[in-house]
Amino acid sequence: MKKYDIAVIGAGSAGLTAARLAAKFGVNVVLFEKHRIGGDCLYTGCVPSKSLITAARDIYKSQNLQKYGVKATVKLDFQAVRNHIHSSIHHIREHDDSRKVLEEAGIEVVEESVTFTNKSTLRSASGEEYTFKKCIIASGSSPNKLNIDGLKQEHIVTSDTIWSLNKLPKHLVIVGGGPIGLELGQAFAMLGSRVTVLERSDKLLGRFDQEVSEAVMKGLKESGVNVLLNASIEEVREETELKLSIKAGDKTEMYVADKVLAAIGRTPNTSGLGLEQADIVFDERKGIEVDDKFRTTSKNTYAVGDCKGGPYFTHLAGEQGATALVHGLFGSKRKVNWSALPWVFFTTPEVAHVGASESELLSSNRGYETEILNYDQIDKAIAEHHEGKVTILLDKKRKILGATIIGENAGELIGYYAYIMGAGKKLDSLAQPIQAYPTYAMALRQHASNVQTKAFTNTFIPKILLKLRGY
């Protein structure tokens, strides 16, 4: 039997963050991973999807250079795109997530599945037992399965399995209009696939304000994606080709497709861990029950990342892993600041958000002021032919309640507002540092300065000060 201070189950973002931090503090840590070190983010999520999106955008742009007087004919080599994706994965794995790198950092890595035998012991698939003082479960999540009568599994791909496609689909039907479905759908459309997205509700990205939904819908249509709202697959026919009877609203049409992407959410991975043996309460659909420090109902065990339920973000999983680790070791009062959690959708246009939406503030009857910066006021955006909009919701003291950015670099820029919110500062703080011109950061600084100046000049103070100084 081997003894450890910290045992971590799962080598995705949450587990790796916790294990690395534990090793830096000098405690004895073991990391278990039954599949691949790096988790979904590295192999089937963030890294491959963003590599695909980058390739798709570049290829799409190369076909649309008429405004510069360039006429080009582009021939796609899908295998080259796949090579680019796998190269990105390999590079990140080798310098960041390999077993060698982790062991050099002082982490013992066990590439086996484990189960709880009691509240302080784990048993590996090979029969080895490990005791721990604290355990952090970071077992991740899996794509929900699509079950439609007549639709064979060989025709279905998920965000996990779509990367094994050897050729570009002629027609990809996507069930689910969330971020994953929209990002992948638009990327495949830019590469040349015919893409149809089926969203069961009457609005895309329902959590967000109508303006976001409309902007994304417009961008999808411009890149060739056919979005059907209030839509579902009613019938499946398998003849010489796959035929889908799709109902959208009160209209039903037959579509021919070669692949169906199931993008209908994710389910926490809780089975096979022996959670019952450690008296850990969980729900197969919602995940492992935790408190605000991510402690489970077994006081020495924590659950972080996807296994405790959404939101399913890599950056959030990492933050939870660190929070659980420092609480387990030091009893830290550190908590995740949910109000300053940024969301980014890597569609074209890119969308980023932090804090409350306007509809949420309206429904809660909370007062706010709206400040808007359009991209046609940003010199860099004008030079690069980018359209977009920054919307900031402020309280009376100019503290940020929420911010939404639609347009180029939205994901990079939202970090400014997330930091200000997380630090409890005013928008004014963004006006303090000098930014280089011409950059988007400079535009955000100038906008914050304008808001601050407007608020100041609307008071009686400037007039009194000027009069006292003889003006």
Language-model features, listed with the residues they occupy:
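A Rossmann-like FAD-binding core segment of flavoenzymes
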Residues: 72, 108-111, 115-124, 192-292, ...
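Short hydrophobic core segments
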Residues: 9, 114, 130-140, 174-175, ...
